[in-house]
């Protein structure tokens, strides 16, 4: 299938639907945002489930008529300090959220885990992030990393664009799930840290991410969950 040019709002809508299919569905909770070339920030509106987001459900954070999520400051806080970030995901996937409720670290057990060879950040306040001060504190905790476990709450994931943010979010949950499964079998045997860092740029390339992004959309279309369908 040839790639089709998509608006930023369409990309955010696709991201929401893909994440819903990949373990991030949680009623109307969870949100994805993206930063446009002009610096404007667009985010899934409040009140709609990830699996049913359409392009017109993606609104500007500056729109005074839009109903925004309470935790929109999670997104604006990161964009304020990370010029490299073009997209942000917040959600409550079960395995990564459960990992964040323990003292265990995510380790590079598989090729999924090597995406986080530089570590996953942590934020130790379980409260909702509803003001600029807390949004800024989360951004500080994230630092230069690509993912953060919000202890007893959920996850925050960033990418330089929407496909990368989605891949990172999906891979974080998969890595946490595989670690949980492996732990049930016995002692964990992670990939050597240096090997993981060397393998990461081989395994995770822009061209691969583009392939995965298009594949996710084809899968959703075949399942009837693509854009333009009926509300879930």
Q: What is each PLM-predicted segment?
A:
Residues 1-232:
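Glycine-rich flexible loops
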């Amino acid at each position: 299938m040839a790639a089709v040019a998509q608006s930023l709002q369409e990309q955010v809508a696709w991201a929401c639907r893909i994440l819903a299919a990949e373990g991030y569905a949680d009623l109307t909770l969870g949100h994805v945002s993206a930063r446009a070339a002009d610096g404007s920030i667009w985010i899934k509106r409040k009140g709609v489930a990830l699996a049913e987001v359409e392009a017109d459900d993606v609104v500007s954070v500056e729109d005074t008529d839009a109903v925004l999520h309470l935790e929109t400051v999670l997104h604006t806080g990161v964009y304020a300090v990370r010029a490299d970030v073009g997209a942000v995901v917040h959600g409550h996937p079960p395995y990564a959220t459960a990992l964040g409720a323990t003292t265990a670290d995510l380790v590079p057990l598989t090729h999924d885990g090597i995406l986080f060879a530089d570590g996953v950040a942590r934020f130790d306040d379980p409260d909702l992030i509803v003001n600029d001060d807390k949004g800024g504190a989360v951004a500080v905790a994230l630092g230069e990393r690509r993912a953060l476990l919000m202890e007893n709450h959920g996850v925050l994931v960033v990418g330089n664009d929407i496909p990368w943010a989605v891949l990172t979010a999906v891979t974080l949950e998969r890595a946490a799930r595989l670690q949980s499964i492996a732990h049930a079998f016995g002692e964990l045997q992670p990939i050597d840290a240096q090997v993981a860092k060397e393998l990461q740029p081989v395994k995770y390339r822009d061209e691969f991410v583009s392939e995965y992004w298009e594949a996710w959309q084809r899968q959703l279309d075949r399942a009837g969950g693509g854009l333009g369908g009926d509300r879930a």
